[in-house]
Curated annotation (Swiss-Prot):
Name used for this protein in its record: Probable endonuclease 4
BP GO annotations: base-excision repair
Catalytic activity entry: Endonucleolytic cleavage to 5'-phosphooligonucleotide end-products
Any one Gene Ontology molecular-function term assigned to this protein's record: zinc ion binding
Note on cofactor: Binds 3 Zn(2+) ions.
Gene: nfo
Enzyme Commission code(s) on record: 3.1.21.2
Function of the protein: Endonuclease IV plays a role in DNA repair. It cleaves phosphodiester bonds at apurinic or apyrimidinic (AP) sites, generating a 3'-hydroxyl group and a 5'-terminal sugar phosphate.
This protein's record includes keyword Nuclease: yes
Length: 293
């Protein structure tokens, strides 16, 4: 089964699937739900250290991706939740940086060229500016250690001391990254909305993405997480919901599915009812295909 333009159009739509039993199972699970993109953890996301990937697992992953038509630009690995690339304490920062480099190396071994991550938190111990500089420095160090892999910064909801919820935070990090060809952004619709950027109508989407273009630049958009929100606009709380069941609503997701600016990047569901993923993927694809018919 190969990736067909007629069947999938120009959108890479999928979900964050389980890699239980080995990362080579992830592409199989993605295709089971009708996806032509997927996200995964390449190791346990709640542990600092994982055993190295075995050669047979690497080979099986690559073979399954080739068989099912998943190219590297359709796959969005996510790093460990423990990593804080802007950590104010030297020991935690060093531990985070080493773990992030390991995550990049795992991506490289799997033939993948994107790594999605949450930027970092100042923990109210250093200034926002200092934290953003540490994050950029962490990316630069990872780039020096591992070739090719792109660091894809995920915007956040603004919960606690997490940075990355304002587009200006993302721009400030990118400004300090030396190799700008290897840094990008993953916009999470739930996080964007919770941070205060409205997405409930086509007009609101136009305004929000125009602001992203002005502050960051659409050319840095390398992926999206497609999630509705359980909480209201500007709540600064990260609570995902199934598409159409939350505060954002289907208009936003139809807008993204039909807009060519979001073609050819992973559009990844992290919605809370995995049993609905096949229907959510199908609906997004219907919107997209109707726009190019």
């Amino acid at each position: 089964m190969t990736n067909s333009k007629n069947r999938f159009g120009n959108k890479f739509i999928g979900a964050h699937v389980s890699a239980a039993g080995g990362v080579d199972n992830a592409p199989l699970r993605a295709r089971e739900i009708g996806a032509n993109a997927f996200a995964l953890f390449t190791k346990n996301q709640r542990q600092w250290v994982a055993k190295p990937l075995e050669e047979k697992t690497i080979s099986a992953f690559k073979a399954n991706c080739a068989l099912l038509g998943f190219s590297p630009q359709q796959i969005l690995p996510h790093d460990s939740y423990l990593i804080n690339l802007g950590a104010p304490e030297a020991e935690k920062l060093e531990k985070s940086r080493l773990a992030f480099i390991d995550e990049m190396e795992r991506c490289q071994l799997l033939g993948l060229n994107l790594l999605n991550f949450h930027p970092g938190s100042h923990l109210e111990k250093i200034s926002e500016k200092a934290c953003l500089s540490l994050i950029a420095e962490s990316i630069n160090l990872a780039h020096q250690a591992v070739p090719d892999v792109v660091a894809v910064i995920e915007n956040t909801a603004g919960q606690g001391s997490n940075l990355g919820w304002r587009f200006e935070h993302l721009a400030e990090i990118i400004e300090q990254v030396e190799d700008k060809s290897r840094v990008g952004v993953c916009l999470d619709t739930c996080h964007t909305f919770a941070a205060g950027y409205d997405l409930r109508t086509p007009e609101a989407c136009e305004t929000t993405f125009a602001e992203f273009e002005r502050v960051v630049g659409m050319h840095y958009l390398r992926a999206m997480h497609i999630n509705d929100s359980k909480v209201k606009l500007a709540s600064k709380v990260d609570r995902h919901h199934a598409l159409g069941k939350g505060e954002i609503g289907w208009d936003c997701f139809e807008y993204i599915a039909k807009d060519s600016r979001f073609d050819s990047i992973p559009l990844i569901l992290e919605t809370i009812e995995p049993e609905l993923w096949p229907q959510e993927i199908e609906q997004l694809r219907k919107y997209h295909l109707s726009s190019i018919a």
